[in-house]
């Protein structure tokens, strides 16, 4: 792995982790302002708890060594969650500033996934042996 790729991976992964953990904590705390925003988007308040837990568990999966299959699920979850957030903001015609957070986390998800080291990827040879 090139040094540049390793740097891109860790910068993207650290920022992604900070973003997901911080928003996950806010969602678990269900602060009034955030609950109102979520309600305006058409989501029930209990949805916040589910998303907050998923975000924090996803960050743990991405940062822990090994568990490549769980990492793939976490990256997929982050991708679906952030792309869904972007489309939700589009559907309710929110201001452009509302797209920035989800779009940034989506880009960081893609960068972290793309530049992850080989030991954090699923090895196809292992999958083929079990099939």
Question: What role is predicted for each listed range?
Answer:
Residues 1-131:
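Membrane-interface extramembranous regions
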């Amino acid at each position: 792995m090139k040094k540049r790729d390793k740097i891109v991976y860790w910068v993207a992964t650290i920022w992604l982790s900070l973003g997901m953990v911080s928003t996950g904590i806010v969602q678990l705390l269900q602060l009034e302002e955030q609950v109102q925003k979520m309600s305006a988007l058409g989501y029930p308040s209990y949805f916040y708890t589910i998303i907050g837990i998923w975000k924090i568990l996803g960050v743990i999966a991405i940062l822990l060594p090994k568990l490549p299959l769980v990492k793939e699920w976490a990256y997929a979850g982050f991708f679906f969650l952030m792309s869904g957030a972007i489309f939700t903001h589009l559907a309710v015609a929110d201001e452009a500033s509302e797209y920035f957070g989800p779009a940034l986390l989506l880009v960081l998800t893609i960068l972290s996934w793309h530049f992850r080291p080989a030991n954090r990827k699923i090895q196809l040879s292992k999958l083929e042996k079990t099939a």
